[in-house]
């Protein structure tokens, strides 16, 4: 199979469909045939009125927007999963690999507000809609006198709820607003030093099956019918990997690897009040990282520069080490690994 049809799995939200269609258009421009399959995840169902959240799952939990898509990928029903990179755990399941990280959109956070031009103009006691522990902690470090309200749903739903007066302001990722053309109410794009983005924010992750057969569980009969024989599936996956790899952006891949290495070394999952952002100028990589106590009262902030050529994981580990030396684990109430 030299040029197989690439089946893309995606969530059904407006933003997820935009992202999947964007990737599909790039693949088609390279001469590939593409199909989309919409997959409903437990994270999507948790936003339905009356849905009972399964025990052990949190609306902010790691993996709630990816499990069903990964299940379809492992079973051979799809060939490519398009995720927001920040939704993926730092430890990738061995059954899968990240084939490509396309060029990144704006990684910053956006401040949405109608009557005030920025965070510092809000009156004391104003309400801000965000459920992200990172955004809440970093906002409290800047404005300890504001309050937070819970607001869930996709971008359009949150913008509608905000416009109805359910909060004075709203914080969303710039990337999503830019992709959907919903920037009319963005009055401030926070600087990297004000609200350091979540590791990988603004980047897409193109996830495929691993080519290492020993990483796969023995397939069920129905899965063999879907994916063909093992040899045929391996040949097919190899061709698909090569097609998708053409969409990779080396600078975005490096930056996000360094950012995610910080989170991985600190431990504790993607819902920590931790931000990391890497960019490159000339021959130097710059990695910004920030950890904030949940109440916003204590901040550990690092900017580390290293020459181009330094492995991304080494850069991330070094910055994590510096954060830990500044008390990051205590701020986050994380037990050191050697004590576990």
Annotated model-derived regions:
Residues 7-9, 37, 81, 99, ...:
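Short, well-ordered beta-strand segments
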Residues 2-49, 55-58, 141-214, 223-229, ...:
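Small-molecule-sensing regulatory modules
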Residues 49-80:
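Short, structured active-site "lid" loops
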């Amino acid at each position: 199979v030299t040029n197989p049809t690439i089946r893309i799995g995606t969530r059904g939200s407006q933003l997820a469909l935009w992202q999947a269609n964007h990737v599909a258009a790039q693949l088609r421009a390279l001469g590939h045939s593409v199909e989309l399959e919409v997959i409903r995840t437990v994270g999507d169902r948790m936003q339905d009125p009356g849905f009972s959240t399964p025990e052990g799952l949190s609306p902010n939990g790691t993996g709630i927007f990816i499990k069903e898509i990964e299940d379809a990928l492992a079973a051979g029903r799809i060939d490519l999963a398009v995720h927001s990179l920040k939704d993926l755990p730092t430890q990738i399941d061995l059954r899968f690999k990240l084939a490509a990280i396309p060029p990144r959109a704006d990684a910053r956070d956006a401040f949405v507000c109608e009557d005030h031009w920025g965070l510092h103009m809000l009156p004391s006691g104003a309400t801000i809609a965000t459920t992200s522990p990172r955004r809440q902690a970093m906002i409290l470090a800047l404005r300890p006198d504001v309050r937070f309200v819970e607001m869930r749903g996709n971008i359009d739903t949150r913008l509608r709820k905000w416009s109805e007066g359910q909060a004075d302001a709203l914080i969303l990722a710039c990337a999503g607003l830019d992709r959907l053309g919903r920037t009319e109410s963005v009055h401030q794009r926070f600087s990297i030093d004000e609200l350091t983005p979540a590791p990988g924010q603004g980047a897409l992750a193109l996830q495929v099956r691993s080519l290492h057969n020993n990483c796969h569980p023995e397939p069920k009969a129905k899965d063999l019918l879907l994916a063909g024989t093992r040899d045929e599936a391996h040949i097919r996956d190899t061709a698909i990997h090569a097609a998708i790899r053409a969409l990779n952006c080396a600078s975005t891949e490096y930056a996000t690897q360094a950012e995610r290495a910080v989170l991985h070394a600190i431990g504790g999952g993607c819902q920590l009040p931790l931000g990391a952002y890497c960019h490159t100028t000339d021959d130097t990589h710059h990695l910004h990282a920030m950890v904030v106590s949940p109440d916003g009262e204590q901040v550990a902030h690092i900017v580390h520069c290293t020459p181009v050529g330094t492995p991304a994981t080494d850069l991330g580990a070094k910055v994590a080490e510096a954060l830990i030396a500044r008390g990051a684990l205590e701020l986050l109430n994380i037990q050191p690994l050697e004590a576990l």
